[in-house]
Amino acid sequence: MLEELKQAVLEANLQLPQYRLVTFTWGNVSGIDRERGLVVIKPSGVAYDKLTIDDMVVVDLTGNVVEGDLKPSSDTPTHLWLYKQFPGIGGIVHTHSTWATVWAQAGKGIPALGTTHADYFYGEIPCTRPMTNEEIQGAYELETGKVITETFRFLDPLQMPGVLVHGHGPFAWGKDPANAVHNAVVLEEVAKMAARTYMLNPNAKPISQTLLDRHYLRKHGANAYYGQ
């Protein structure tokens, strides 16, 4: 079942340690088959160097395991909520990558300080509000998804393919699992660049709207011309 998607999700998960986005098992990637309403996700707590295609877990959009012998990632409810709320996305990544997590722990969004950021994220990468005690003590992973979508009430998830969960870490997404990992890698890099920029110049300001528009829209706008 869903062998092609399983392979894509496996390969995307294996990219996380390659790009140094994870330590031990601190992360997961999923992908969705929209037509069938099924999600493939990494199993919980399995080391990346042990993962095989047969370990991938298939769940439906209510979280029931459809295929697989292992438990799905503990973050599955977050992934499922985001898929239901963001219909344009096809893959999701969660990590505790160092620099993005630093910003999440500081409770700060990442301003668009340069064109590297603007090529991928159309403005400041937001940080959610802190979760309440009730949210944390309740259906925690589902509530994590809800606090993300609350943060995106006035944001387009296709123009802003990532978020920082306050005190937790980053989530990123894309058109498919590989694209989601790509965006997660960029998020980590711009988080590092921004932190180091503020070390050199604590008064650094975001780039102008004109420059932000130029760089984002030349890659993603209606008249995009970047690339082949």
Curated annotation (Swiss-Prot):
Record's function text: Involved in the degradation of L-arabinose. Catalyzes the interconversion of L-ribulose 5-phosphate (LRu5P) and D-xylulose 5-phosphate (D-Xu5P) via a retroaldol/aldol mechanism (carbon-carbon bond cleavage analogous to a class II aldolase reaction).
Listed pathway(s): Carbohydrate degradation; L-arabinose degradation via L-ribulose; D-xylulose 5-phosphate from L-arabinose (bacterial route): step 3/3
GO annotation, biological process: L-arabinose catabolic process to xylulose 5-phosphate
Active site annotation, chain numbering: 119 (proton donor/acceptor), 226 (proton donor/acceptor)
SMART domains the UniProt entry points to: Aldolase_II
EC number: 5.1.3.4
Name of the protein in question: L-ribulose-5-phosphate 4-epimerase
Higher taxonomy: Bacteria, Bacillati, Bacillota, Bacilli, Bacillales
